[in-house]
From Swiss-Prot:
Keyword Cell membrane (UniProt): no
Record organism: Mycobacterium sp. (strain KMS)
Family as reported in the entry's similarity comment: Belongs to the acetaldehyde dehydrogenase family.
NCBIfam families: ac_ald_DH_ac, PRK08300.1
Keyword Cell wall biogenesis/degradation: no
Keywords: Aromatic hydrocarbons catabolism, NAD, Oxidoreductase
One annotated GO biological process: catabolic process
Record-given protein name: Acetaldehyde dehydrogenase 1
Reaction it catalyzes: acetaldehyde + NAD(+) + CoA = acetyl-CoA + NADH + H(+)
Residues bound to NAD(+): 12-15, 163-171, 282
Residues at the catalytic site: 127 (acyl-thioester intermediate)
Pfam families: AcetDehyd-dimer
A molecular function GO annotation: acetaldehyde dehydrogenase (acetylating) activity
EC nos: 1.2.1.10
Length: 310
């Protein structure tokens, strides 16, 4: 059976370049193509130096090749991916979407990756979602196991202004809407809210997030704290710089919390510094999570291919 899935990266910007370095370390993925639209792109130049086939002629060029990728990672824009997605599917190419297009189901690795390993297209939601929804999921999991519910969860993502490009700035409303939806549909809260803060501090600060979850007053708080620690450890397997700033904090019901008990969790995300600076943990967690999803898809695909040949 093939040892690795053949991979194309569509997009040649900062996120794509950082992703390339991560994929080069993979035991299951072989980055072979990088596609862009700017012939002078630094990303394409770096990819060529690393031995990849490159083109500035976009998806048309990629799909015209005799050899086609098994898997595409796309970090372009939502409208570009929406146009390309049906073409990938028609060509039998799986897609991991790092844009807001949301053609396929949103995936948060600790929460729902196993449910979507056979999907033709998966979406990586948002950087804030990748950093905070695992915590909401951890709280909901522990509360649900005790017969309760999480009626409300709110996340506040603070990222360095230096790491927020024009795309992020132009899509703040889309970020909050998409992340809020993920807090509910993937995290498991009945209602969700998301806030993003662009921190102008210089030198730049790493990504820091605050996650508030309303919980039943009589729930086992130790079980919630352990569930959070377990999920943090799982995220750390692909984002080593993801960490709790302190133990989860529990507050009894009050007027300020609408009569609900609350657990508050503080996390920070330091990037690996593969290409993006370490303070850009908000971008690093996107590329690391995408690489994690790709590896799990590859493991599943290669295992099935091996079984069919046996």
């Amino acid at each position: 059976m093939p040892e690795k899935l053949q991979v194309a990266i569509v997009g040649s910007g900062n996120i794509s370049t950082d992703l390339l370095y991560k994929l080069q370390r993979s035991e299951y993925l072989e980055p072979r193509w990088m596609i862009g639209i700017d012939p002078e792109s630094e990303g394409l130049a770096r990819a060529r130096k690393l031995g990849l086939e490159t083109s500035h002629e976009g998806v048309d060029w990629l799909l015209a090749q005799d050899d086609k990728p098994d898997l595409v990672f796309e970090a372009t824009s939502a409208y570009v991916h929406r146009a390309a997605a049906p073409r990938y599917e028609e060509a039998g190419i799986r897609a991991i979407d790092l844009t807001p297009a949301a053609v396929g189901p949103a995936v948060i690795p600790p929460a729902n990756l196993r449910e979507h390993l056979d999907a033709p297209n998966v979406n990586m939601i948002t950087c804030g979602g990748q950093a905070t929804i695992p915590i909401v999921y951890a709280v909901t999991r522990a509360v649900t196991e005790q017969g309760g519910t999480v009626p409300y969860a709110e996340i506040v993502a603070s990222v360095s202004s230096s790491s927020a490009g024009p795309g992020t700035r132009a899509n703040i409303d889309e970020f909050t809407k998409t992340t809020s939806k993920g807090v509910q549909t993937i995290g498991g809260a009945a209602r969700g809210k998301a806030i993003i803060i662009l921190n102008p501090a210089d030198p730049p600060m790493i990504m820091r997030d605050t996650i508030f979850c309303a919980i039943p007053e009589d729930v086992d708080r130790d079980a919630i704290a352990q569930s959070i620690r377990d999920v943090v450890a799982e995220v750390q397997t692909y984002v080593p710089g993801y960490r709790l700033l302190n133990d989860p904090q529990f507050d009894d019901p009050s007027i300020n919390s609408g009569g609900q008990a609350v657990v508050t969790t503080f996390v920070e995300v330091e990037g690996a510094g593969d290409y993006l600076p370490p303070y850009a943990g908000n971008l690093d967690i996107m590329t690391a999570a995408a690489a994690k999803v790709g590896e799990e898809i590859a493991k599943e695909s290669l295992s099935l291919a091996g079984g069919a040949q046996a």
